[in-house]
């Protein structure tokens, strides 16, 4: 497996554009799992390398992961490796697509694509109020958007972002603005789980 991880790193550094693009998509997808404290499996890395090398498609990678976890179910309810692997593969596939529309419906669709079969509420706006203790805030409790106003709040934030002009902004200003927009989406917390996509 370490050879596959080295191969994965090599692809990011020295391959042709198509392989490099897939490599970055997989690297990003795996990294996003780590942000949520999830660890992907060695099997996922092996599958990713096969996809990057052109041996299998994203659809085949997803099918292989599905079969792998049907044959090797988690023995511990706390083990979220299957979730990490499946979501990482779906993120890599989404990042490799060229079509995208910046709308609340697309946002809901992305959640549905990533979490179908993992969360029963995949792609659906939550219909209940929540508070959560967040590790990123040292366990402080966060109040999220009210369930009755989630759709309207989401549409408002997207419409405000669409109006914003990035013209003549420095990279630091762009990063700051995007961070504020993303933090607003997280504060809305439109889904019961899976909001940090």
Regions found by a protein language model. Give the residues of each.
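FIC/Doc superfamily catalytic core
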Residues: 1-197
């Amino acid at each position: 497996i370490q050879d596959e991880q080295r191969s994965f790193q090599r692809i990011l550094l020295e391959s042709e554009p198509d392989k490099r693009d897939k490599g970055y998509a997989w690297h990003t997808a795996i990294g996003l799992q780590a942000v949520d404290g999830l660890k992907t499996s060695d099997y996922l890395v092996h599958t990713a390398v096969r996809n990057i090398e052109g041996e299998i498609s994203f659809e085949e990678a997803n099918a292989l992961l599905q079969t792998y976890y049907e044959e090797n179910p988690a023995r511990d309810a706390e083990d979220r490796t299957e979730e990490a692997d499946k979501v990482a593969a779906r993120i890599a596939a989404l990042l490799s697509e060229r079509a995208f529309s910046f709308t609340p419906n697309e946002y809901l669709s992305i959640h549905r694509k990533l979490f179908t079969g993992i969360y029963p509420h995949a792609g659906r706006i939550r219909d209940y109020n929540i508070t959560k203790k967040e590790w990123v805030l040292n366990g402080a409790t966060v109040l999220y958007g009210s369930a009755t106003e989630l759709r309207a709040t989401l549409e408002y934030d997207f419409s405000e972002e669409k109006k914003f002009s990035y013209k003549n902004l420095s990279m630091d200003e762009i990063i700051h603005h995007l961070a504020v927009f993303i933090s607003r989406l997280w504060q809305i917390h439109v889904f019961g789980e899976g909001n940090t996509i």
